[in-house]
Each structure stands twice: as C-alpha cells, then as structure tokens.
Amino acid sequence: MRVLVVEDELLIRYAIAETLGLAGHTVIEADNGAAAVRALTNSAEAVDVVMLDYRLPDSNDLTLLAAIRRLSPQSGVILMTAHGTPEVRHGALDLGAYEVMHKPFELHDLEPLLLKAFAASGPSQSTPHTPAGWRP
C-alpha cells in the first residue's frame, strides 16, 4: 500500500513512516501542505491512504483536506490532530476523511486503522493515476 504521511513534526513523521515501512508499506513523506500537494500531483502511482496532520505550517484548517480529496478522491484520508474538537471531527468526516486520530496515539494502532481506511477508500486503489494536466 502507498501511504502519504503529511506531518511537520520530524520525529512524529519519522516514527509513523518507519512503522509503516517496516509493515511493508511504501511511504511518501511531506512536511507541509504544499509538499503534500506536489507529492499527489507528481506521483506516477496513486496514493492509497493519506495520513494528514491537521495543523501544518502552511495549513491549519480543513482546506488542505478538501484539496487532497479533490486531487486524489480514491485515497483514504486519516486526519491526525492534537487539537481535535467535535467541530474539527465533523468537518473532516463531512469532507471525506475516513477517521480523525487524536495525538498522541500508539504506533501499533496505525496498521489496523490504515487497513480499514484502505478498504473503505474505493475501487481504484493501488492503480496508477494520471497527474493533473498530463496528456498522451
């Protein structure tokens, strides 16, 4: 499974990426919203699941989640937050996030949640996609 981890805290991003990599997943890392958008638009293969931090240096609302859902509608999205409120949770779910995961969390909880998000994300998982603007 291809997983995009969008997290500005280096140690958290590293721990998630390492855990998922050891579980056999291909992990793409981004430390801000712009890097996440680039990763989604420049990737030759579809991203199956996006693990997205709610508060990033260049995005601290649900705008980035909406952009990710437009760019990669086949990807399951798990929103990670240490500042979760019921409004954030409902807004994220309304925009198509699979789940809102509250920090801190246990790394061993990632794999089952990732698999559920992957299973719920739709039929076009793990298939190549066409980057925006590309024409044969």
Where are these regions (language model features)?
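Alpha4 helix (beta4-alpha4-beta5 surface) of REC/receiver domains from two-component response regulators
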Residues: 63, 84-99
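Short amphipathic alpha-helix used as the core "switch/output" element in two-component signaling
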Residues: 38, 62-74
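Acidic catalytic/metal-coordinating carboxylates
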Residues: 32, 60-63
